[in-house]
């Protein structure tokens, strides 16, 4: 929708009705000048795909997605890939029970300081490759994953 709007610095989305939206992939990808965005009124109840949603938003410094309902999301591939200025993300309400792909989700989020993944359920995740690659400043908090997910996640926490 706003993909490759490289001059976009901020946007008012308060009048957007996203109630029937199922696909948000690439929505803000490569908005390299985007510094802030308020998505608190987004209704994400029916969304199934959030892959590459913020890919390449290299000027974005923080984002609060605590209002997102992610129960039906299946794909979070490269969701924040290349958000190199991103220091904080509020994912406190993320329910990932149906997600199958988290590969590259935080790849190259080199300024990201901490993540609270307390609601992340990785039972159905098939791919976590490069999930935290190049996240040199990252401290992960409150991780609760399945035994299978723990083995997969441990492999990618230290890259």
Language-model features: locations:
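Negatively charged
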Residues: 1-159
């Amino acid at each position: 929708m706003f993909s490759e709007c490289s001059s976009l610095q901020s946007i008012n989305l308060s009048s957007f009705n996203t109630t029937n939206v199922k696909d948000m992939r690439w929505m803000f990808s490569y908005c390299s000048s985007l510094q802030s965005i308020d998505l608190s009124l987004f209704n994400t109840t029916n969304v199934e795909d959030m892959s590459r949603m913020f890919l390449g938003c290299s000027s974005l410094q923080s984002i609060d997605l605590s209002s997102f309902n992610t129960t039906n999301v299946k794909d979070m591939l490269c969701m924040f890939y290349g958000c190199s200025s991103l220091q904080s993300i509020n994912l406190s309400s993320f329910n990932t029970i149906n997600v199958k792909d988290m590969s590259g989700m935080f790849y190259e989020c080199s300024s990201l300081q901490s993540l609270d993944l307390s609601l992340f359920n990785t039972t159905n995740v098939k791919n976590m490759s490069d999930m935290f690659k190049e996240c040199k400043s990252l401290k992960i908090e409150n991780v609760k994953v399945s035994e299978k997910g723990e083995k997969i996640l441990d492999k990618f926490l230290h890259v």
